[in-house]
Amino acid sequence: MSQLQQFCHNRFSWGLLLLSAIGLELAALFFQYGMDLAPCVMCIYIRVAVLGIILAALIGILQPKVWLLRLVGMAGWAVSAVWGFKLAYELNQMQVNPSPFATCSFYPEFPSFMPLDTWLPSVFSPTGMCSDSPWSWLSVSMAQWMMLGFAIYGVIWLLMLLPALKSAK
């Protein structure tokens, strides 16, 4: 078994994924409560995509030697990374090319069986405008940083895909 395959089959790799996503969620909460930056509905959806990566990592960390759990974890990771990139790209477009006709809603549209904004409004209730870009670092907006983050998640997923899905011999 190759070193990359061994890495994919242990809890440490899934733990790194989990810690990175938890770090992003904590950063989002710091921006919201520490720096008093109001999250928009797209920001909330991006948080949900990061939460999807957390859930995928938790599935993978349960029993990383079991092929089916790795498969489900990898699938959740991929869907969350692609969806998160798409959302961050759309938010970036709203900020770079603002239009009075292309605005985001003030109310998140979560499924009726999972109203996250009702269950945990302090985390999932939007209070800001999508066209606002109140924070940047190195002349890069938060939406652009999230595009980079989700792209990195996607590249790492691609590197881990085949070794993770091969069974141990």
UniProtKB/Swiss-Prot annotation:
A single cellular component GO annotation: plasma membrane
GO terms of biological process kind: protein folding
Compartments (UniProt record): Cell inner membrane
Pfam families linked to this entry: DsbB
Topological domains, Periplasmic: 31-48, 90-144
Taxonomic superkingdom: Bacteria
Entry annotated with the keyword Membrane: yes
Membrane association type: Multi-pass membrane protein
GO molecular function, a single term: protein-disulfide reductase activity
Keywords, in A-Z order: Cell inner membrane, Cell membrane, Chaperone, Disulfide bond, Electron transport, Membrane, Oxidoreductase, Redox-active center, Transmembrane, Transmembrane helix, Transport
Main location: membrane
Keyword Signal on entry: no
InterPro entries xrefs: DiS_bond_form_DsbB/BdbC (IPR003752), Disulphide_bond_form_DsbB (IPR022920), DsbB (IPR050183), DsbB-like_sf (IPR023380)
Family the entry assigns: Belongs to the DsbB family.
PANTHER family from the UniProt entry: DISULFIDE BOND FORMATION PROTEIN B (PTHR36570:SF2)
Function: Required for disulfide bond formation in some periplasmic proteins. Acts by oxidizing the DsbA protein.
Official protein name in the record: Disulfide bond formation protein B
Organism: Shewanella frigidimarina (strain NCIMB 400)
Gene: dsbB
